[in-house]
Amino acid sequence: MALSREDVLNAIAEMSVMDIVELISEMEEKFGVTAAAAVAAAPAAAAAGAAAAEEKDEFDVILASFGDKKVGVIKAVREATGLGLKEAKELVEGAPAPIKEGANKVEAEELKKKLEEAGATVELK
């Protein structure tokens, strides 16, 4: 008498975790397959994508908007970039605009913090 799929699933459902692990190992040996390969492929790909995002070492600091404290933001931009008053004002008024390109993570975070303290909305890309 052949077992139906439902019978097999019911039998597996009644097994302990250790018995299921042993069953999987025996099935891998008997049929020459690996159960973990298909399951691990998706998380590995996701982890690789996450690792690539974490490893980004150059950031562009983008001034999204200057909010209601335009003068303070202009001063912060001048201090950060060394631009003159006119150039900094044009840069701020032209938001969204890049403030610094290719900055390392620490430098980009510090610049973002300074600009946000001055009232700006800043993005790191």
From Swiss-Prot:
Swiss-Prot/TrEMBL GO biological process terms:
translation
Cleaved signal peptide residues: none
Pfam family of this protein, just one? Ribosomal_L12
Q: Which GO terms describe its molecular function?
A: mRNA binding; structural constituent of ribosome
Which InterPro entries does the record associate with it? Answer: Ribosomal_bL12, Ribosomal_bL12_C, Ribosomal_bL12_C/ClpS-like, Ribosomal_bL12_oligo, Ribosomal_bL12_oligo_N_sf
Q: Which UniProt keywords apply?
A: Ribonucleoprotein, Ribosomal protein
Sorted alphabetically, the Gene Ontology cellular component annotations on this record are: cytosolic large ribosomal subunit
- Complexes and interactors: Homodimer. Part of the ribosomal stalk of the 50S ribosomal subunit. Forms a multimeric L10(L12)X complex, where L10 forms an elongated spine to which 2 to 4 L12 dimers bind in a sequential fashion. Binds GTP-bound translation factors.
Q: Which NCBIfam families match?
A: L12
| Functional summary from the UniProt entry | Forms part of the ribosomal stalk which helps the ribosome interact with GTP-bound translation factors. Is thus essential for accurate translation.
Family note: Belongs to the bacterial ribosomal protein bL12 family.
The protein here is known as Large ribosomal subunit protein bL12
